[in-house]
């Protein structure tokens, strides 16, 4: 264990073997964010700190959303790695009291990996949540370290918003869902290391059951509707240990956990294995003792295992027992207070002259066709046509973007992050939506070897958010994406939520095509472009559609998807440009300096 000296100094004694196992999980990079939490505190934030980020949508509803990575598991076992990535992020949304409504994915691979695509489509289609958008980037940089970033979104009623912590001593914690096995043991530690060597084993990969997930979704939402849920956590990385300790540590409380009450799939598991297993489709619910029987009744009605697994105490101690024998007894807050690495003092430079880094041109349409993107009947704009657009029946609409610029990451991580955010804003504005907030997926190689690259990426994100006035609501960090010392490009994935007040803006069916904007990037021009994009997007009577494009291949794909078989002559652009393609009669509606190259 990397931090064992720090642990024993804080405990004031030698740590037991069981405690070392527990803190190895909780203080891993995956759970503890040792290298990134100093940077995360500097970000402009909103609705931050729960299982997922939240922003208000209207007077009655909130949106919960988050991006999560499952990179290491997908490299070792593509199908289960990708599938459980979908399942885990869905439960994060669910734990906020929201019904999951959409999934998007950002995939970076050296070739189309059928197992990853099948894992996402099989899980999402089976649980009835539409996969409404995404991006697919193909490059040899990701040969040994594919990136699988999944974004999930949900809508909840304001009165059903669930906190991610207990409220008082005397409450109980019910764990319900699927049975617990050995799959995923030390998965959090595995996800915090280089993929080289014997640790990259299938034992560390969780195995998903989408039908159990569907039952869990409906059971939990029924509990929420009946007012039974007073706090909730998904059982993801760190399993029972992580979920139950987080619930009490945030409230300066303690817990006594009874491990013999956890339903097992493998009856010979030892107490520590039960404590840290990352078996999927499980949740922890905080409730009052008098409500616990009804919580268990609902779970079992949906064919799920359930029992009171813990009591909330006022001691501040986290005590895990097995048949009355203490397994660990440590301060609950200590489990959550992983050591923090110092942040790197980075000073950005002027934006460089970027060169094109070739990513393979692919038609993502064949991937989208495997996804059920219309289930739920709330998908307004289907995949491949720019940002996804969803409706809330009886209310407004919202847009969903997931975007990255890995092609710029090696050249300058600061400006790559900055430009990724700006382009996400353009994409959101182009469908007539107002950006509300983002969720970030930080994908990086080895921060111990190259700390300046991580610092640059984080500062680029921070400064771009401040420039755009778009806060961060949630996020994820995946580090040590390396194989035999060779790492991926710094790859920031941004998921953006936007709000559409009116989904019924009339549109013409045809019109001329324009390239709008500037072929060279200048930051001071950006808000000029945004203002005009927003204005013409909302003036629907003369605009057929509008698309930001990040690369020429992206433009080509979107032209094909809207049925345009044409050669559009776009001026030769820099890799960082400020161009939007507009289909519609806008020439007389815009300032001359913004109209580019009418064809």
Annotate each predicted stretch with a short phrase.
Residues 1-599:
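Glycine/proline-enriched, intrinsically flexible loops and inter-domain linkers
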């Amino acid at each position: 264990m990397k931090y064992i000296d720090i642990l024993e100094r804080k405990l004031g004694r030698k740590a037991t073997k069981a405690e070392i196992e527990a803190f190895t999980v909780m203080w891993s990079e995956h759970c503890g964010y040792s290298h990134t939490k100093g940077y995360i505190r500097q970000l402009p934030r909103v609705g931050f700190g729960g299982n997922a980020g939240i922003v208000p949508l209207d007077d009655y509803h909130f949106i919960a959303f988050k991006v999560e990575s499952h990179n290491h598991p997908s490299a070792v076992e593509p199908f289960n790695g990708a599938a459980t990535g979908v399942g885990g992020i869905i439960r994060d949304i669910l734990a906020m009291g929201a019904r999951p409504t959409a999934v998007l994915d950002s995939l970076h691979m050296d070739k189309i990996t059928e197992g990853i695509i099948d894992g996402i489509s099989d899980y999402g289609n089976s649980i009835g949540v539409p996969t409404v958008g995404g991006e697919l980037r193909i490059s040899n940089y990701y040969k040994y370290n594919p990136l699988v970033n999944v974004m999930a979104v949900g809508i909840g009623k304001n009165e059903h918003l669930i906190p991610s912590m207990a409220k008082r001593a005397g409450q109980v914690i019910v764990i319900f869902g699927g049975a617990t096995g050995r799959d995923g043991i030390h998965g959090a530690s595995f996800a915090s290391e280089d993929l080289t060597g014997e640790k990259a084993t299938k034992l560390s990969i969780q195995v998903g059951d989408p039908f159990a997930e569907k039952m869990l979704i409906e059971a939990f939402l029924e509990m929420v509707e009946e007012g039974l849920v007073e706090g909730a956590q998904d059982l993801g990385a760190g399993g029972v240990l992580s979920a139950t300790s987080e619930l009490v540590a945030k409230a300066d409380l303690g817990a006594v956990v009874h491990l013999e009450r956890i339903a097992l799939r493998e009856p010979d598991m030892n107490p520590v294995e039960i404590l840290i297993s990352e078996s999927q489709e499980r949740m922890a619910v905080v409730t009052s003792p008098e409500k616990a029987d009804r919580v268990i009744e609902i779970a079992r009605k949906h064919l799920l295992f359930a029992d009171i697994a813990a009591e909330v105490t006022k001691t501040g101690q986290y005590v895990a027992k097995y048949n009355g024998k203490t397994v660990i007894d440590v301060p609950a807050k200590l489990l959550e207070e992983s050591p923090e690495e110092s942040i790197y003092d980075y000073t950005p430079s002027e934006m460089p002259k970027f060169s094109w880094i070739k990513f393979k041109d692919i038609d993502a349409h064949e991937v989208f066709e495997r996804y059920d993107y219309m289930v739920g009947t709330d998908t307004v704009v289907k995949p491949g046509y720019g940002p996804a657009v969803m409706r809330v029946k009886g209310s407004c609409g919202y847009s969903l973007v997931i975007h990255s610029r890995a092609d710029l990451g090696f050249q300058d991580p600061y400006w790559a992050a900055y430009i990724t955010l700006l382009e996400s804003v353009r994409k959101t504005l182009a469908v007539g939506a107002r950006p509300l907030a983002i969720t970030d997926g930080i994908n990086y190689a080895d921060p111990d070897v190259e700390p300046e690259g991580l610092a640059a990426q984080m500062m680029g994100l921070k400064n771009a958010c401040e420039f755009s006035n778009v806060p961060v609501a949630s996020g994820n960090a995946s580090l040590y994406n390396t194989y035999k010392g060779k790492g991926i490009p710094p790859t920031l994935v941004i998921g953006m939520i936007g709000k559409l007040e009116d989904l019924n803006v009339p549109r013409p069916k045809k019109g001329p095509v324009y390239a709008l904007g500037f072929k060279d990037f200048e930051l001071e021009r950006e808000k000029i472009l945004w203002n005009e994009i927003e204005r013409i997007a909302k003036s629907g009577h003369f605009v057929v559609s509008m698309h930001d494009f990040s690369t020429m291949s992206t433009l080509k794909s979107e032209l094909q998807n809207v049925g345009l078989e044409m050669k559009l002559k776009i001026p030769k652009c820099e890799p960082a440009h400020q161009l939007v393609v507009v289909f519609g009669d806008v020439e007389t509606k815009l300032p001359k300096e913004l109209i580019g190259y009418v064809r």
